[in-house]
Amino acid sequence: MLQICNFLHNFSHLLVIYAPNLIEFREFKTQGDFMKKIIALSTVAFLSTALYADAAMQKQIDELTKKLEVMEKKQDRNIQKIGEVNALAAKDNIKFDVDFRTSYDNLQYKTASGQKYKNDGLYSNRLWLGMGYAPTDTMVFKGQLAYHKAFGAAANSSSGMPQRGMGFDTFDWISSEALNDDKLRVREVYWLWTPTVGSFPMTVSVGRRPSTGGYLVNLRDDDTSKSPMGHVINMEFDGASAGVSLDKFVTGMNFKLCLGRGLTNAKSWANQADSATQVNMQTPTSPNYIKEDGALDTIDMAGFIFVPYDDGQYAVSTTWYRGFNVPGLTYGGSTNPANPAAPHIMALKTVGDMDGMAISAKVEGIGDGINDFLDETILFASFAASITHPDNITSHMTPMGPVQAATMLGSTDSETGTSFWLGAQLPNLTGGKFGLEYNHGSKYWRPFTYGEDTMIGSKLAARGDAYEAYWTQPLIKDVFSMQVRYTYIKYKYTGSDGFFGDGGTPMTMSEAQAMGMDPVEKAQDIRVYFRYRY
């Protein structure tokens, strides 16, 4: 084709050049014949030139196409190599993230008699160092190290001196939540397997599970929701979970079985050494890690989380659990057996089992595209209950004499407590979030919320009324933020933050005063924090 175009192109140009000479020796019948010849020759010249240009362009296009095909093949090979490198890097390296918060808290307390206590300036630092590793698409390792410490302070156990007094700062359930020393502690560490069995996506996980900052609590805490429902569970523990997605039947439906262990009854390594009679040496006479009689029984927990519906805007979640062999402070021996009215020692003993349950509903976005404000508004409501099952077998002493049955929350009967919780989170003009919350607890209400992020005790455990308002504001994108929070609790009964024994006995303020006590009736915490996350 290209050769034909070249011939026609050259021939037409020759005709145009020599046509004037040729027509001098020819005769034309009319001037019109002469013009027709000229037009014909010009047309041939134009068409041949255009045809030649099209063919040349086609040749260039063909050459470029071949070059592009070669480049695409090289690019595909490069992309494959880059993917292999990225996959190798992801599998060979643990990825870290940092969450560092500096807080100021102003604490105010008022007792039933009107006595006031305060701390005008409690400063603290909290560090969460997260880590993750995904060797395959269905297997993930997750971990988080934590440090939470008051400025310049050390825990009692650090030096043996009571720099901050006695307490339960190092109790395992809250060791990373309460103010402690300057050591990094393992707050979370677990593996997560996400297989698909049949057509059902599943999850299986074992380790120190993410059991604080759960559902709905995460809104105020400005975090992604963790596994448990925050109305009843907010504490650290070791355990396992197995879940299945039932989304093919109902939108967002899923079921998860949860198991946990809050304490292990086992003696320590080389726990006892007695002097041997035959040889002059110390010899261990008790095997390692066996069960120890008289100590707290192993504390276990079993339950489930069932989400019947969740479409991203409307969601309902339910949970039930039982805590086995939960502990409580019970009356021990008298400090003066000869005087029945003398003070009695409180001992931590196993007191029974505890059931808990909750149902929570959340609306994330009011209406359907009415306006941005309603689209970003979140409303929620939650109802929960707790039921005691006392053992009634541990003997203890009271000012009235020996009693053969230890109480559970001050009662030898099974008691039921209830709580409801309402909240709203609203967007503001500065890109932040403004929240309001209210909760109420009854006389025998007792959740497992010891790890709640407050300095005045768990507001969700309050036997009375709690009010809270907060403003969370991003300062530098999603990397640096601040929050101002006000929490106010008015207790109707004592024992809100106690364990499950006599120390958790509910009494009205007047009943407690009649027994010579002066319990806290009102508490408030004003908090300001700045938080860096990357």
Identify the residue ranges that each predicted region occupies.
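Outer-membrane beta-barrel "beta-signal"
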Residues: 518-534
